[in-house]
Amino acid sequence: MAAIALVVTAFGAFASVAAANGGGGQVNIVRQGAAPSKVPANTHYFKTIQAAVNASKSGDWVLIEPGIYYEEVKVTSAQSGIWIRGMNRNKVIIDGQGKVGNGLEIYKASNVWVENLTVRNFEFGKTGCLVEECGNDIWWNGGSGSKKIGAHGWYGSYLTAYDTGTTGGYGIFTDNETEGSWENIYASGFADSGIYIGACQECNARVSGAIMENNALGYSGSNAGGKLLLENSIYRHNTVGIAPNSENPGDGPPPQDGECGRPNIENPTPTNPNPTPIIKTTNIPRCTIIRNNIITENNNLTAPVNGSTGVAPWGAGVELPGDYADLIESNIIANNPTDGVMAFEYPNPFTPENGFAGTLFFQLAGNRVSNNVFVHNGSRGGAFTGDVMLAGGFSEIELFKELGYPESHSVNNCVSNNLFTGATFPAKIEGTWGCQNKTTPSPGGGEAAVDYLVGLQIEADTIRAETPPVGQPAPPPQQSMPNPCQGVPKNPLCS
């Protein structure tokens, strides 16, 4: 595992070094005021960010002077390989003013860096431009919905995304792309998630130094796996802290699978998008790693939600719905009212309009929860609340048997070497189940766990009906890039 982690960490470091040493290229400066009378040959001035982007090609820089910019910005494949950098994280602001649209979208453009700026208040609509299509503040879009990888190389640092309304979709978002990193980022107030990585079976990605708060989900990652590292970050005051998940159809192809060496699937068949992984032992190489994070007080039922996040079980630090081969290690997981880690099998979609036709039954297999510190989780009380809840056996439910639910492969999940201060399910989980059991516990023949999860959904709905979600507060200033001229060719801003 150390070698795997080293590879992923080194990849993230490479991205930072490359960004810091951009070398030559044209410098396109965005200034709302008048340009100086004399400028170097390699420098051009523009009044809008979009105009500066349009004039850029691979190796060029877009430097943005402080100001509030009321525009949507789109980067296309013609601008692959450019840098977009604000000169002050807190004073360079792309402002959506609560209108429907996307803030900064990088569409099928590879190797694009975005750094040191703020994007805020872009919304999704009730009709027309819906969630996922709009309401995304910073979006590396490799071809959303295509089920294919459409771009490579997405890099962001010193970024702030926030929404003070109730219809912001995603803060910092990538799908259908591989090979990227985010460092020193912040997101709050989003009805889906603060950060999202999706639709990459082999993501080759790293997130570090993130602060995610006041979102429906701090992190969400549908069908994202392989080499994927979430580390050294804070997830607090969300409805749910971290939720990697399998999903169908969604950001396909499914499932979410953290086992090393999982290929990106091209042209999956409609009836079997990606075969269910068969996990034969607890001793498998895991490359999707959630480590060294603080995951605390994810109990915020005033945060905005959408149709998907509004039905998620609330109050957990980490949720693993239908996940395979993820490693949760060396985190502090504290003060989450339902469960520190909540892991369960996941039929999805759960209640389609045409019965269960088209449903995929995602198992829970090969995951490991080790060396974490759990403190004061489960304050809601009741069965299944506490530090860790591990539930399988849904195939034993009579309804699912009648509908052809497959034999359970929810095996070889492992819980070891954690510090617990609360209850676990099963009780004393490391002694009774731990890493020595091939199967996953099935409380009450599976029905009891389903009742618990559905009960949390109903509970959240009831609370929201009495006290509807509200816009979350704007954040305080965040740390700006120490030297925004680092690596930039000489120009009037960087002499």
Model feature map: region roles:
Residues 2-13:
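Bacterial N-terminal signal peptides
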Residues 37-38, 125-135, 139-149, 249-284, ...:
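Intrinsically disordered, low-complexity Ser/Thr- and acidic-rich flexible linkers and loops
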Residues 353, 362, 377-495:
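Acidic, glycine- and Ser/Thr-rich low-complexity intrinsically disordered tracts
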Residues 69-74, 95-103, 123-131, 135-137, ...:
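Short glycine/acidic-rich loop motifs that flank beta-strands on beta-rich extracellular proteins
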Residues 12, 17-51, 55:
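Right-handed parallel beta-helix/beta-solenoid
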Residues 50, 54-57, 68-85, 93-116, ...:
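Extracellular beta-strand-rich solenoid/capping regions of secreted or surface-exposed proteins
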Residues 85-91, 110-121, 149-165, 170, ...:
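Right-handed parallel beta-helix
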